């Protein structure tokens, strides 16, 4: 029997027990001949309201149709009056009633239920036992649904190690809302929250207190609110680093490059990924610039400060670019130090424009001679401007030349 059925039966038993002592022989006779109104039956006993819903059936077993009423008693009046006195039982208190309700055993998964009860059961759809995509869980997870509405790209999140499992364990209201409010306080705009969390979903699993401590550390190092916003936006993983690690990174770049505190701060504001990336590539590139390329320490310092991206660039690409600029084009170290942005340019663009200038007889990079062309003019200008102002040729001539090489 289902739990609710047992509770109904127990309720009926309690109600019957509450009024069982109110029956008398005279009351039974009245029930046999005709049911008296229930309020009149209970008026002399001042019963609690919860006893009022008792059927007369509890007072006497039902008789068959047409059965005659019991004959009147021939006992003396005194005896009949004595018998008519109702026999009462102790009242069932509300506490006792609650105890009886508490005694109802809990439901069991093995308990048999009727077909009518079974068809009323609505089971939630099962989660996929395993899946390679978060898309299969979106309809089952309120957290994933709200993140999608926020602009998070789950197809990118699931490519990050254990990021999908993390999101499935989080509650949006309890775990995620407070992180979103924190990011807004840092300065991340509403329309940037989705892309930010797509790049760094792991921040949703961080303790709020730890995140606030890291922001407080940056402020203690004299980083302004706008600067912190810029750094966090450009390097989404920045706030995953502990205070100790952030402090070690700042100290590393200050000491390795020989920069002042102000210049070190300016360096990481412009390129905050220096604080979140690996240090080994940085050390190797510094070694390449000094040992292989032959730059002096102060020149390396200037190059790194002007173009910090060089510190994390591919060593192979750096070697190829330097070899072409220095050994083929004849650009000296001091000019490369003055305009290190040339190392960020594509080598193919440098080659195409240099060869076109040679074809025109205008490849002149010495600032002490006429018709000097700076490295900035060589690589930074759009093709049309480069052709008309630097090469003194048309765009069609440049395109025809490119087809010959």
UniProtKB/Swiss-Prot annotation:
Residues 1-64 form a transit peptide. The keyword Cell wall biogenesis/degradation does not apply. It comes from the Eukaryota. It is found in: Mitochondrion. Pfam families: mTERF (PF02536). GO terms for molecular function: transcription cis-regulatory region binding. One of its GO terms (biological process) is mitochondrial ribosome assembly. Coiled coil: none annotated. One of its GO terms (cellular component) is mitochondrion. Its main location: mitochondrion. Belongs to the mTERF family. Contains about seven structural repeats of about 35 residues, where each repeat contains three helices. The repeats form a superhelical structure with a solenoid shape. Binds promoter DNA and regulates initiation of transcription. Required for normal mitochondrial transcription, and for normal assembly of mitochondrial respiratory complexes. Required for normal mitochondrial function. This is Transcription termination factor 3, mitochondrial. It comes from Gallus gallus (Chicken).
